[in-house]
Amino acid sequence: MNRLFCDTLYFTALVNPKDQWHQSAIEIEPLVESVDLVTTEEVLIELLNFYSEFGKRMRFEVSTFVRKLLLNPKFEIVGRSEISFLDALELYDSRLDKGYSLTDCISMNVCRELNINEILTHDHHFEQEGFKILL
């Protein structure tokens, strides 16, 4: 295992000590420290959007958290493109019976492209697509 993909739900749990998955996110830290990590701009946007109504203090903490990720050489942050959007829209359209968000679809496509099978999340949508979730 060389790389793990970080989903929004992992970051949400990591940032907020009151999150029900916070302890799981902390406990997996030794594994996280031993590998390179990948996420997408869409995941970071989703994280910032989620905390946008949590008040000034939390908005500042999340913004600081994201800025640290951007500077961390262990993190690869895959940028947005028209092709990634359209490819994700294809997956979204092909899974109309699922509750996948477009961000999930982008993440799944990135994981497939980069041969990443393990996801830091508790989102079972990833399991439905054959990925192993680690929270």
Per-range role (PLM):
Residues F11, L44, F126-E127:
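A generic structural signal for short hydrophobic patches within well-formed alpha-helices
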Residues M1-T39, F54-T64:
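Short, well-structured N-terminal submotif of metal-dependent ribonuclease cores
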Residues M1, M108-N109, E113-L135:
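Acidic, PIN/NYN-like endoribonuclease modules and their adjacent C-terminal/linker elements
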Residues F50-K74, V78:
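Helix-adjacent hinge/juxtasegments
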Residues F75-N117:
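Active-site neighborhoods of divalent-metal-dependent phosphate/nucleic-acid chemistry enzymes
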